[in-house]
């Protein structure tokens, strides 16, 4: 997996330190906006994280004061996208490779669409940013 170069600010560095202290596993990626933070962990690390600390999500939310999402990375694009959107009741993922473009449409539970998109599209942008760090993706949208 090829990763793009990323600049990390002091706040993100602090969030990474908090995650690693509470979750007690190594973090691969941290992507955030004003309302949400997505922590990406290694393959098969979620079970280990919850074995070490069942209250990890609530403790992170208490310390960071943002909506917390944790997803396992995968070398497979479909699996990685499913992992990121899992919490929203993903029921369909369409990946289109045409004209040197990779476009993804994700279907989630109807009541979750607003949360996935976020205010002014901030959450869906965050998810695209996370996926784009590992895969060359042009767009991610939510099936309406």
Curated annotation (Swiss-Prot):
It comes from the Archaea. Disulfide bonds: none annotated. GO terms for cellular component: cytoplasm. Residues 101-144 form the KH domain. It is found in: Cytoplasm. Keywords: Cytoplasm, RNA-binding, Transcription, Transcription regulation, Transcription termination. SUPFAM superfamilies: Prokaryotic type KH domain (KH-domain type II) (SSF54814). One of its GO terms (molecular function) is RNA binding. Pfam families: KH_5. GO terms for biological process: DNA-templated transcription termination. CDD domains: KH-II_NusA_arch_rpt2 (cd22531). Participates in transcription termination. Belongs to the NusA family. HAMAP family: NusA_A. This is Probable transcription termination protein NusA.
């Amino acid at each position: 997996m090829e990763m793009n170069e990323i600049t990390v600010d002091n706040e993100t560095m602090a969030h990474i330190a908090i995650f690693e202290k509470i979750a007690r596993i190594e973090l691969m990626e941290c992507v955030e906006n004003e309302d949400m933070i997505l922590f990406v962990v290694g393959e098969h690390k979620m079970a280990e994280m919850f074995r070490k600390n069942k209250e990890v999500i609530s403790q992170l939310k208490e310390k960071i004061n943002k909506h917390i999402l944790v997803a396992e990375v995968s070398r497979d694009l479909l699996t990685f996208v499913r992992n990121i959107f899992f919490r929203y009741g993903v029921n369909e993922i369409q990946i289109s490779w045409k004209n040197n473009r990779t476009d993804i449409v994700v279907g989630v539970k109807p009541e979750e669409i607003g949360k996935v998109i976020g205010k002014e599209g901030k959450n869906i942008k965050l998810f695209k940013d996370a996926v784009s760090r590992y895969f060359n993706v042009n767009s991610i949208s939510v099936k309406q």
